[in-house]
């Protein structure tokens, strides 16, 4: 019996694995429009550090949820869920196939499953205490506190993202349940006829690509991009918790020399990629394809297209 739910394609994978190029080729084959599955690409002026697709690279394929907020704005998982579900409907109404591409697992999961969020419930005094802890002992100490209490949430949230780390701790403090427990008690049926494809790669090769990508970002103006935000006094905003920005802020603050900041950026990017792979493997029904070079990209594209077409009966 044919699945009557709205078809959606999801392409996930760690940073630097090659999602962007492959997704555009697939979107053209599938008559799809792409929705960003990256929590930081929503911010304007943060192009290089978040590896946003350029106008030329899109090859005419429409992209959504990119450059929609100012760097000073806040953006939650609940906001993402609401926006993306609206975009899925819009795209489908145009007769196109919605395709989410990215690596922010919790955001993508929130769209696909019947998750509800209690964004307004909290404890301001506890939150202030956690903010003080982060300021005095650092983001790593705060993240370690979350890892001890809720390892699953800690795996999904980067230590630089202090706001989300505090929110996860606050949920536990207020309700007595971890964020992971809250999500588990909610309905686990996919809301869409979703095909989830994951790109993976030999870890050492991937780490090498990440290091090269950071070098290329710096060559193409990442430090200037970060300095513009720094000069605008964008400091405590969620956007600056992104990898690449927080590390270079440390340099601009005079706390560390540039080579040390760059090495920290590379290390944080590698650690994030490792967490992304672990999270997607444990949390979502993903069909994986290996992109370790040498690989025939056109052949991979064809194989993935046939997998999607078969599952969606298109």
UniProtKB/Swiss-Prot annotation:
**Top-level taxon:** Bacteria
Cofactor(s) needed: Mg(2+)
- Biological process annotations from GO: tRNA modification
Q: Please indicate if the UniProt record lists Transport as a keyword.
A: no
- What keywords appear on the UniProt entry? ATP-binding, Magnesium, Nucleotide-binding, Transferase, tRNA processing
- Give a GO molecular function annotation for the protein: ATP binding
The UniProt entry, under InterPro entries, shows: Dimethylallyltransferase, IPT, P-loop_NTPase
**At what residues does the UniProt record annotate the site feature described as Interaction with substrate tRNA?**
104, 127
Q: Which reaction does it catalyse?
A: adenosine(37) in tRNA + dimethylallyl diphosphate = N(6)-dimethylallyladenosine(37) in tRNA + diphosphate
Q: What is its EC number?
A: 2.5.1.75
Where does the record place the region Interaction with substrate tRNA? 38-41
The cross-references to Pfam families, in alphabetical order and at most eight, read: IPPT
Q: Where does substrate bind?
A: 15-20
Task: Give the residues the record marks as binding ATP.
Answer: 13-20
Assembly and interactions?
Answer: Monomer.
- Function text: Catalyzes the transfer of a dimethylallyl group onto the adenine at position 37 in tRNAs that read codons beginning with uridine, leading to the formation of N6-(dimethylallyl)adenosine (i(6)A).
Q: Which family does it belong to?
A: Belongs to the IPP transferase family.
This protein's name:
tRNA dimethylallyltransferase
- Give me the gene this protein comes from: miaA
């Amino acid at each position: 019996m044919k699945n009557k739910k709205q078809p959606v394609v999801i392409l996930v994978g760690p940073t630097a694995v090659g999602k962007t190029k492959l997704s555009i080729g697939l979107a053209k084959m599938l008559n799809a429009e792409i929705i960003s599955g990256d929590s930081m690409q929503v911010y304007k002026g943060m192009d290089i550090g978040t590896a946003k697709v350029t106008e030329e690279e899109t090859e005419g394929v429409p992209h959504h949820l990119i450059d929609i907020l100012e760097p000073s704005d806040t953006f939650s998982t609940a906001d993402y869920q609401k926006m993306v579900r609206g975009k899925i409907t819009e795209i489908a109404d145009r007769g196109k196939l919605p395709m989410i591409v990215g690596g922010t697992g919790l955001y993508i999961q929130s769209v696909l499953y019947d998750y509800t969020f209690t964004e307004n419930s909290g404890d301001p005094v506890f939150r202030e205490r956690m903010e003080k802890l982060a300021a005095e002992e650092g983001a790593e100490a705060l993240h370690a506190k979350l890892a001890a209490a809720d390892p699953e949430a800690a795996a999904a949230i980067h230590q630089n993202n202090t706001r989300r780390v505090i929110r996860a701790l606050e949920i536990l403090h207020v309700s007595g349940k971890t964020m992971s427990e809250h999500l588990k008690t909610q309905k686990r049926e996919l809301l869409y006829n979703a095909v989830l494809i994951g790109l993976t790669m030999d870890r050492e090769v991937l780490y090498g690509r990440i290091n090269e990508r950071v070098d290329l970002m710096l060559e193409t103006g990442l430090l200037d991009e970060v300095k513009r935000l720094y000069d605008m006094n964008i400091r405590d905003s969620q956007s600056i918790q992104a990898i690449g920005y927080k590390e270079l802020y440390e340099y601009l603050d005079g706390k560390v020399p540039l080579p040390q900041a760059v090495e920290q950026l590379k290390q944080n990017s590698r650690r994030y990629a490792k967490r992304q792979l672990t999270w997607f493997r444990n949390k979502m029904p993903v069909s994986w394809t290996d992109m370790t070079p040498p690989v025939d990209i056109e052949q991979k594209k064809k194989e993935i297209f046939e997998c999607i077409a078969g599952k969606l009966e298109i």
